[in-house]
From Swiss-Prot:
GO biological process: rejection of self pollen
Reaction equation(s) it catalyzes: L-seryl-[protein] + ATP = O-phospho-L-seryl-[protein] + ADP + H(+); L-threonyl-[protein] + ATP = O-phospho-L-threonyl-[protein] + ADP + H(+)
Membrane topology: Single-pass type I membrane protein
Subcellular location: Membrane
Organism encoding this protein: Brassica oleracea var. viridis (Flowering kale)
Main location: membrane
UniProt name for this protein: Putative serine/threonine-protein kinase receptor
Stretch forming the signal peptide: 1-32
UniProt entry tagged with the keyword Nucleotide-binding: yes
UniProt GO MF annotations: ATP binding; identical protein binding; protein serine kinase activity; protein serine/threonine kinase activity
Domain called PAN: residue spans: 350-433
This protein's encoding gene: SRK6
């Protein structure tokens, strides 16, 4: 019996040993780790990795060009394919690196234990430990160890893609947070640093993606038509894949998912500038390029043929004028120089115009278009024909026979025609004069006799003359009808009566905002009642209003003696329609009638930041956490203007009265009347007309008219110090004889007494809420504020660095140099040729009236 038991025991142990060995050597049976706790770490030397459930993705370290990176790749794909790189622009210089959780952040440390990458979580619940986890879909997340709710992830790699879009990732905007998720190519095939190409969603009208090289558009995807992007006909429905476009109040994004997990599929922006869909077939073990965009080097090039022309690969030349249009420059057109595009043969007369139907078209660029998804193509045609500025219309969605309405009121650009047997493209209806419609019909009809032809021509001429005589009467009737409709739908239609009243060098066609009838604004504000007055400044008055549907608005009414003249007003109108960010005020429309010029904005319940910082009643309601969040929000909004929007925009009048607060105390930058658009390669500009608010102007701008992104950075620095101290830079005075806030803060900083500048309201609240006040966070804000107001522009950080410094707890922030003290200007006019210098020991006094107001964007 004893021998039998030994044999049994020996057999059992042998079986157990074999089983363990099989687990260790067989990948399918191996047990992988997909989480990293606060007590664990990954190092290059250990060669440890995290592997997702199902063993599809793996996170670890890799080396290329003698540099080390933390990244993610497909585990089962023999050809190593990277889909995400954490420290792409901050590689490790040697084989010493550690990934760990520190201070509720996921941190990558180099050989000297300095962070080179982290998750930028500024605050977390210290009582609840966090873990990093690699999910089955390839999302690398940070979460509370006891909470698996995806909506409450603290951080996730899906929000910060590099060059690859995986299934279930989203590419586009999170409107709640202002986060824009876009792709940036590798520098080269073996260099993962940020390359020259980006693939980013623009949402100004119909959302569409732009492939850009160093922020200059190279290719446009075309708008989403309910099935696919109209400019990517190759992206067809597949049996193993479902893709969708999400557009609601919370997000605008593209995503796809796999219905058959035996295939891997990804969208990648490669370093050569092509956006590709690649699918891995396990049986043949290769990545198959399903499609690549752009396809054609001519017709897929952004605005290849200029305005009012379309590209067709089946014609020679490939560029063709739309029917009813001729080349703008015949000589250049014959030389295959098409950038000038085409012009109308016959100008539109408003009444009597018609449409030509262009089939299988990639719709024109929609940044200047208006969209109404509630109506069909018939109503869309009526709306277009009643708007003298309408140049074309189309369906917004081609499913189920078509629905929705897109109307263009600007020139038509970047159009392409697809082959007659192509499944892509859609109908585009372009507005033509009656004479050009007739030419088309005659060309396609039978040859008629000369007598009949002359008769028809005479009839057409008589008809056109008769129509032209009735043009004013027709326009007046349309205006009355629009007024009636506008009373019911004041924000959904363009109103035409204001067009006749507006005169000046600016054309009505240049406006990109819905026009609101004067009568509607008068009713909304109760005839501009003083009870609805929100604020007043040099530009005029801001009123609160309420539309018939109950929507509250803010109306910025320029006075006839406004310091913001027609130039600034038109600048604001044309600029703000192109901007969309959670930290920018949303414009709803404008009203131009006679001498009246008004902008209509969303109404923000908490008015302007200065009413909280400097007002007696509201000041105590602004605790430190709210001040810190407001500072971060303004920084993100300014970063969007400088870097992340389609245009580089210099605000030039950033101040606390231009920071508005919504009901959730989210800050929104307003007032773009003085803003300027910079080219991507433009670093600074100068002007003889210095505008803005003294106290917020940088020295180089106030004295020499030189402005740049660093001018806005200076203004932001002043705002930061005002938020921390609760004191105005202008008119500041204290017993130590510092006559501006910057001098006061700088002196306290040098003496190591920086916390003395903190608003007493915050200090007084410590007894009831001691946990809210965080001295290190306050000191960091003061230091960043001083960095932003340094005297020399080249010493000031870019807003990208500012946002980075605010978001990191472990970053070593540089020590600031002295600020630019001289921020005021002599009250006397200076000869433009004269020069004057700023003396650090000299004070300037300006007899100039100023009023803090709510100033909508």
């Amino acid at each position: 019996m004893k021998g039998a038991r030994n044999i049994y025991h020996h057999s059992y142990m042998s079986f157990l040993l074999v089983f363990v060995v099989m687990i260790l050597i067989h990948p399918a049976l191996s047990i992988y780790i997909n989480t990293l706790s606060s007590t664990e770490s990954l190092t290059i030397s250990s060669n440890k990795t995290l592997v997702s459930p199902g063993s599809i993705f793996e996170v670890g370290f890799f080396r290329t060009n003698s540099r080390w990176y933390l990244g993610m790749w497909y585990k089962k794909v023999s050809d190593r394919t990277y889909v995400w790189v954490a420290n792409r622009d901050n590689p490790l210089s040697n084989a010493i690196g550690t990934l760990k959780i520190s201070g509720n952040n996921l941190v990558l440390l180099d050989h000297s234990n300095k962070p080179v990458w982290w998750t930028n979580l500024t605050r977390g619940n210290e009582r609840s430990p966090v873990v990093a986890e690699l999910l089955a879909n390839g999302n690398f997340v940070m979460r509370d160890s006891s909470n698996n709710d995806a909506s409450e992830y603290l951080w996730q790699s899906f929000d910060y893609p590099t060059d690859t879009l995986l299934p279930e990732m989203k590419l586009g905007y999170n409107l709640k947070t202002g986060l824009n998720r876009f792709l940036t190519s590798w520098r080269s095939s073996d260099d993962p640093s940020s390359g020259n190409f980006s693939y980013k969603l623009e949402t100004q009208s119909l959302p569409e993606f732009y492939l850009s090289r160093e922020n200059f558009p190279m290719h446009r995807s075309g708008p989403w038509n309910g099935i696919r992007f109209s400019g990517i006909p190759e992206d067809q429905k597949l049996s193993y894949m479902v893709y969708n476009f999400i557009e609601n109040n919370e997000e605008v994004a593209y995503t796809f998912r796999m219905t058959n997990n035996s295939f891997y599929s990804r969208l990648t922006l490669i370093s050569e500038g092509y956006f590709q869909r690649l699918t891995w077939y396990p049986s043949i073990r290769i990545w198959n390029r399903f499609w690549s965009s752009p396809v054609d080097p001519q017709c897929d090039t952004y605005i290849m043929c200029g305005p009012y022309a379309y590209c067709d690969v089946n014609t020679s030349p490939v560029c063709n004028c739309i029917q009813g249009f001729n080349p703008r420059n015949i000589q250049q057109w014959d030389q295959r120089v098409w950038a000038g595009g085409c012009i109308r043969r016959t100008q539109l007369s408003c009444s009597g115009d018609g449409f030509t139907r262009m089939k299988k078209m990639k719709l024109p660029e929609t940044t200047m278009a208006t969209v109404d998804r509630s109506i069909g193509v018939k109503e869309c045609k009526k709306r277009c024909i009643s708007d003298c500025n309408c140049t074309a219309f189309a369906n917004a969605d081609i499913r189920n026979g078509g629905s929705g309405c897109v109307i263009w009121t600007e020139r038509l650009e970047d159009i392409r025609n697809y082959a007659t047997d192509a499944i892509d493209g859609q109908d585009l209806y372009v507005r033509l004069a009656a004479a050009d419609i007739a030419k088309k019909r005659n060309a396609s009809g039978k040859i008629i006799s000369l007598t009949v032809g002359v008769s028809v021509l005479l009839l057409l001429i008589m008809f056109c003359l008769w129509k032209r005589k009735q043009k004013r009467a027709k326009a007046s009737a349309i205006s009355i009808a629009n007024t009636q409709r506008n009373q019911n739908l004041p924000m959904n239609e363009m109103v035409l009566s204001s067009k006749r009243e507006f005169s000046g060098e600016y054309k009505f066609e240049e406006l990109e905002l819905p026009l609101i009838e004067m009568e509607t604004v008068v009713k909304a504000t109760e005839n501009f009642s003083s009870c609805n007055k929100l604020g007043q400044g040099g530009f005029g008055i801001v009123y609160k209003g309420r539309l018939l549907d109950g929507k509250e608005i803010a109306v910025k009414r320029l006075s006839k003696t406004s310091v913001q003249g027609t130039d600034e007003f038109m600048n604001e109108v044309t600029l703000i329609a192109r901007l969309q960010h959670i930290n920018l005020v949303q414009v709803l429309g404008c009203c131009i009638e006679g001498d009246e010029k008004m902008l209509i904005y969303e109404y923000l319940e908490n008015l302007s930041l200065d009413s909280y910082l400097f007002g007696k009643t509201r000041r105590s309601k602004l605790n430190w956490n709210e001040r810190f969040d407001i500072t971060n929000g303004v920084a993100r909004g300014l970063l969007y203007l400088h870097q992340d929007s389609r245009f580089r925009i210099i605000h030039r009048d950033l101040k606390v009265s231009n920071i508005l607060l919504d009901k959730n105390m989210i800050p929104k930058i307003s007032d773009f009347g003085m803003a300027r658009i910079f080219e991507r390669d433009e670093t600074e500009a100068n002007t003889m007309k210095v505008v803005g608010t003294y106290g917020y102007m940088s020295p180089e701008y106030a004295m020499y008219g030189i402005f740049s992104e660093k001018s806005d950075v200076f203004s932001f620095g002043v705002i930061v110090l005002e938020i921390v101290s609760g004191k105005k830079n202008r008119g500041f005075y204290n017993l130590d004889y510092e006559n501006d806030l910057l001098s006061y803060v700088w002196s306290r900083w040098k003496e190591g007494r920086a916390l003395e500048i903190v608003d007493p309201v915050i200090v007084d609240s410590l007894s009831s809420q001691p946990s809210i006040f965080q001295p290190q966070e306050v000191l960091k804000c003061i230091q960043i504020g001083l960095l932003c107001v340094q005297e020399l522009a080249e010493h000031r950080p870019a807003m990208s660095s500012v946002v980075w410094m605010f978001g990191s707890e472990a970053t070593e922030i540089p020590q600031p140099k002295p600020p630019g003290y001289c921020v005021r200007r002599s009250p006397y006019e200076l000869d433009p040729s004269s020069s004057w210098q700023c003396d650090e020991n000299e004070s300037w006094t300006v007899n100039q009236y100023t009023c803090s107001v709510i100033d909508a964007r």
